[in-house]
Amino acid sequence: MMEGLKKKFNSWLWGPTSGSEIDISLDGKVVAITGANTGVGKETAHEISRKGARVIMLCRDTVKAESVRKEIMKDTGNQVDIVKLDLASLESVRSCADTLTKKEDRIDILINNAGVMACPEMKTKDGLELQIGTNHFGHFLLTELLQPLLRKSTTTGFTPRIVVVSSMAHEGPMWPWPFALIALGLALLMPRFVKIYWMLLPRFRMNWDDLHFQKIPGSYEPFIAYSQSKLANVLFAQELSKRVAKDGIKVYCLHPGLIDSELWRHHKQKGSIGSFMLAPFEYFMKTPFLGAQTSLYCALEPSIVNESGLYYSDCAVASPSPVALNEDDQKKLWRISEETVGLSKKNT
């Protein structure tokens, strides 16, 4: 009962959530989703499987993924596969892409959903700051390597889509934890007017001189690093949409909402200040099911099939930070990304 009330309250608070209600058959379609074993990714996979697609779960934890795979297949009766993917390892990303290239004839929809948020300072296996390494660089490499499979989807008459899950956090915060919770509170309690808050802050930008917080000891701030990784998502989606337009691939970027999911795990440890400060907000957060709605909308909605390079929130076009629309920054991030993951122009 409480979950039902929360769902209704969330729908009123956050606006329309119509992704699951899209009447479309995905019979015969192949949809790959990163981080599909938990939270928003799990709900996205479940709903897409219900519409007839064969879902490929790209997950680091294959044990948890297997349990979810069985759950989805039991409910929908449709095939669900698992391919191991650790986005914090470029070697794992390449291995995943190689497996898919050998096994699959095509991929119709790719949803870059997985992510890590506001974690303590850590590095990927390649020495990158963990959040931008996982949320951006890992997905950048995966998307580039899977483009041949996505292009093959066009031969079936289908318009392939790439969905990039970002966050409104790409606009900030400039302030470190715990002040970032001020933004969270305003976003939850006044979602219709949250832009006013962001307008009061200096424009958040990529730290081009030190993307990985290595030059100044102690400069790492979890929420600033997260915001940077989410801004990278939007910049990437913008530039990607231009580069794949000639191939007939459409690109969508989105803010899923503030969601009560495992993303908060680093701040919900029992007895921590984060757990104490988050407690009043949890009821106002979207459930993972509601958080999946805009991903589903971008992946499935027929009326936006000719749109590409736009940013969405609550199943509607929204305005990203003006910084994300800077074409020089889009190109700069692309060059840095190619160098970081070891892709030359002739490889892409």
Please annotate each region the language model reported.
Residues 4, 8, 276-279, 283:
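Low-complexity, intrinsically disordered, cysteine-poor segments enriched in small/polar
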Residues 239, 294-297, 336:
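Generic recognition of well-ordered alpha-helical segments
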Residues 93, 229, 278-318, 325-329:
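C-terminal helical subdomain
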Residues 271-274, 333:
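A catalytic-pocket lid/entrance helix-loop region that shapes and gates access to the active site
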Residues 117, 318-319:
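Short, active-site-adjacent cap segments at secondary-structure transitions
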Residues 322-348:
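C-terminal amphipathic/interface module of NAD(P)-dependent oxidoreductases
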Residues 4-272, 340-348:
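Rossmann-fold NAD(P)H-dependent dehydrogenase/reductase core
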Residues 57, 85, 283, 322-325:
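Pocket-edge positions in alpha/beta enzyme catalytic cores
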